[in-house]
Swiss-Prot record:
<dbReference type="GO" id="GO:0005764">
    <property type="term" value="C:lysosome"/>
</dbReference>
<keyword id="KW-0964">Secreted</keyword>
<dbReference type="GO" id="GO:0005576">
    <property type="term" value="C:extracellular region"/>
</dbReference>
<keyword id="KW-0732">Signal</keyword>
<dbReference type="InterPro" id="IPR001223">
    <property type="entry name" value="Glyco_hydro18_cat"/>
</dbReference>
<dbReference type="GO" id="GO:0005975">
    <property type="term" value="P:carbohydrate metabolic process"/>
</dbReference>
<dbReference type="InterPro" id="IPR029070">
    <property type="entry name" value="Chitinase_insertion_sf"/>
</dbReference>
<dbReference type="InterPro" id="IPR011583">
    <property type="entry name" value="Chitinase_II/V-like_cat"/>
</dbReference>
<dbReference type="InterPro" id="IPR017853">
    <property type="entry name" value="Glycoside_hydrolase_SF"/>
</dbReference>
<protein>
    <recommendedName>
        <fullName>Chitinase domain-containing protein 1</fullName>
    </recommendedName>
</protein>
<comment type="similarity">
    <text>Belongs to the glycosyl hydrolase 18 family.</text>
</comment>
<keyword id="KW-0458">Lysosome</keyword>
<dbReference type="Pfam" id="PF00704">
    <property type="entry name" value="Glyco_hydro_18"/>
</dbReference>
<feature type="domain" description="GH18">
    <location>
        <begin position="80"/>
        <end position="394"/>
    </location>
</feature>
<feature type="signal peptide">
    <location>
        <begin position="1"/>
        <end position="20"/>
    </location>
</feature>
<dbReference type="GO" id="GO:0008061">
    <property type="term" value="F:chitin binding"/>
</dbReference>
């Protein structure tokens, strides 16, 4: 309990300070000439070019963001597992995965859903999104990179879950459908997302189900990655819906835990995407004795949030939109040491003041350093959302 109290104090002491980031000072309009962007790739890494800094300027991001090091695409800077998610609606993510495949140990295309069709009957959908040519390209670029599609328990009713929880035969059929699909499609395993669907209820029943799935996948020599919510609920001092007890129970049968240490703030409570003290607390609460740390994949976000002072609104933004904001408004980027994130402010003509939190090379590097210090891997949501030169850091 002493550890929990200490972690809660640290998070509470640092995170609320940034919630009032929309200052009264309007952004001043700079000269009309748009900043330039490099189109050529670089011979050196962003680390060598001095770009990983708290003192970063908008014009430098605009100039350099596409210029990753083409000569070191297979050079890794993270020794632990690195998982990258790819979604069908973001084609650039597919290209990024192919280009930087060697920097990832695991790539998870968000393709699949498992549906319950009746008693002991399961059907996996989304197979129309599977791109075997792309998988072949990934494996050609990096023989060690494993393809582990995410599978979502889609359209399940509470009664569906109850039926599975109460029947070993149901669990066996469900796990069997997953194993067969992996064999048919030549997948290396699955990322399973189900825990949050029951809102923290039926924890022991979920542990039982996932234990059986894990054992079936391991028997078939397939990887099992489980998506888990943060151990400390964002913006509160409450423990999350997946805690140390469940972690200890599942760690022996789960190969990796994809920990969602992002989405800390919201339009109703604008602020940082993943304050560093909160990220650290989420890991230490799950595994205070570092027994299974290498199985935790610290979640990194490659998207940002644009908050408006009008009506407590906000929306996610991707790299292209972020660059547009930098070009149009030429804002000053501010570094907050307590949360280890950059943010900026700008003003629309009739839209009021905005604050933008978007990852930078420095904020990503700080989290990579934390992962190394704590002995974890990382998972990235999602490839293609951020800026191309981010991948030099991996």
């Amino acid at each position: 309990m002493r550890l929990l109290s200490t972690l809660l104090f640290l998070v509470a002491a640092t995170c609320p300070l940034i919630h009032a980031t929309l200052s009264k000072t309007d952004s001043k309009k700079a000269a009309s000439k748009a900043p330039e962007t490099k189109t050529r790739l670089s011979d050196t890494l962003v680390q060598t070019r001095g770009l990983v800094s708290t003192d970063v300027k908008a014009k430098d991001i605009v100039l350099e963001h596409r210029s990753y090091c083409a000569k070191k695409l297979k050079e890794r800077h993270v020794s632990a597992d690195v998982l990258g998610y790819v979604t069908p609606w973001n084609g650039h993510g597919y290209d990024i995965a192919k280009t930087f495949a060697a920097k990832f140990t695991l790539i998870s295309p968000v393709w699949l859903q498992i549906k319950r069709k009746g008693k002991e009957a399961y059907h996996i959908t989304g197979l129309h999104d599977v791109d075997q040519g792309w998988i072949k390209d990934i494996r050609k670029t990096s023989k060690s990179t494993q393809i582990v599609p995410r599978i979502l328990f889609d359209g399940w009713s509470y009664q569906d879950f109850e039926s599975v929880f109460s029947s070993e035969d149901e669990i066996e059929e469900l796990a069997g459908a997953m194993v067969q699909t992996a064999k048919d499609e030549r997948f290396d395993g699955f990322v399973v997302e189900v825990w949050s669907q029951l809102g923290g209820q039926k924890r022991q029943e979920l542990v039982h189900l996932l234990t059986h799935i894990g054992e079936a996948l391991r028997l078939a020599k397939l990887r099992f990655i489980l998506v888990i919510p943060p151990a400390l609920a964002p913006g509160t001092d409450h423990l999350g819906m997946f805690g140390r007890k469940e972690f200890d129970q599942l760690a022996p049968v789960v190969d990796s835990f994809s920990l969602m240490t992002y989405d800390y703030s919201s339009p109703q409570r604008p602020g940082p995407n993943s304050p560093i003290t909160w990220v650290q607390a989420c890991i230490q609460l799950l595994d205070p004795e570092s027994k299974w740390r290498k199985k935790i994949l610290l979640g990194l976000h490659f998207y940002g949030m644009d908050y408006s002072a009008l009506g407590a609104s906000g929306e996610p933004i991707l790299g292209n939109r972020y660059i547009e904001i930098l070009k149009e408004h030429k804002p000053k980027l501010l570094w907050d040491q307590q949360i280890a994130e950059h943010y900026l402010e700008y003003k629309k003509n009739k839209g009021g003041k905005h604050a933008v939190f978007f990852p930078t090379l420095k904020s990503i590097q700080v989290r990579l350093d934390l992962a190394e210090e704590l002995g974890t891997g990382i998972s990235i949501w999602e490839l293609g959302q951020g800026l191309d030169y981010f991948y030099d850091l991996l």
